[in-house]
C-alpha cells in the first residue's frame, strides 16, 4: 500500500524501469514451511484449523482464564496494550492463543460435539529489555471439547504431533491456574519448557458456559524446528 501511494504521487509513467543490480531467487520462509507442515499434522490428528484475531481484551486473555498478568505461567506475560482501542474487545495483543480457542468453543455451544479445534498464530508480550519492548512468537494451540475429553487425550495428540518432528517430549506435572490441579503438565521439548497441556479448570468452563470437559495444549512453534 505504501509503495502504491508513493507511485501514484510520483507518477507511475515517470518511473524509469531498470533491472536490479543483484539477482535474487524468491522462496518461502522456513517458518512458513514449518507452519504449513504442523497445520497439516494437526488436521491429520482430527483438529479443525482456525484463524483468529491476534487482538483480544485483557478480561479474555487473563481474567476469564484465571491467569494473573505478569506471572510466569504460560499466557501470563505482561500485555502489549493499545492506547486508544477502537473496541473494548480488542485492547491488547494476546499473550497466548488458548483463550481465543475457548472463545470459539463458547460461541459454538449450540453445535454438536466433539469439537476439536487448533490454531497456529501470533502471541506477544511486553519486554522492557527488547529493542522494541515487545517479544513475539508463533504458538501452536489446540483444544478438545467433548463429553469424554481428558488430559490423556490432549497428551496423546501432543505426543503424536511431536513424533512427526522427531523431538524429545517430556510432560512433568505442573500447576497452572487455567487447568485442574493434578491434571496439567509442562510441555518440555528437548529439555526446554515451551508450553502446557491439561484439562481446563471447571471455573474456566463455567465462565465460558461450556458444559463439556475441555482438554488442551499450547506450546511454541519453534520447538518443532
Where do the PLM segments sit?
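Extended beta-strand-rich architecture
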Residues: 1-225
Amino acid at each position: 500500500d505504501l509503495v502504491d501511494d508513493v507511485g501514484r504521487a510520483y507518477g507511475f509513467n515517470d518511473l524509469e524501469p531498470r533491472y536490479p543490480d543483484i539477482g535474487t531467487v524468491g522462496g518461502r520462509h522456513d517458518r512458513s514451511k514449518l507452519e504449513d507442515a504442523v497445520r497439516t499434522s494437526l488436521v491429520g490428528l482430527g483438529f479443525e484449523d482456525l484463524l483468529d484475531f491476534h487482538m483480544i481484551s485483557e478480561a479474555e486473555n487473563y481474567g476469564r482464564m484465571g491467569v494473573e498478568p505478569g506471572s510466569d505461567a504460560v499466557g501470563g506475560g505482561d500485555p502489549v496494550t493499545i492506547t486508544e482501542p477502537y473496541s473494548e474487545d480488542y485492547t491488547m495483543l494476546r499473550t497466548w492463543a488458548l483463550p481465543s480457542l475457548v472463545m470459539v468453543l463458547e460461541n459454538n455451544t449450540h453445535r454438536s460435539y466433539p469439537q476439536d479445534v487448533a490454531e497456529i498464530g501470533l502471541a506477544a508480550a511486553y519486554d522492557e529489555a527488547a529493542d522494541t519492548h515487545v517479544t513475539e512468537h508463533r504458538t501452536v494451540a489446540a483444544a478438545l471439547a467433548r463429553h469424554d475429553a481428558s488430559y490423556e487425550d490432549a497428551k496423546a495428540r501432543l505426543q503424536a504431533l511431536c513424533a512427526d518432528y522427531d523431538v524429545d517430549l517430556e510432560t512433568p506435572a505442573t500447576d497452572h491456574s487455567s487447568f485442574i490441579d493434578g491434571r496439567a503438565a509442562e510441555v518440555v521439548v528437548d529439555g526446554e519448557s515451551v508450553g502446557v497441556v491439561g484439562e481446563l479448570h471447571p471455573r474456566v468452563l463455567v465462565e465460558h458456559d461450556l458444559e463439556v470437559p475441555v482438554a488442551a495444549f499450547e506450546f511454541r512453534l519453534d520447538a518443532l524446528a
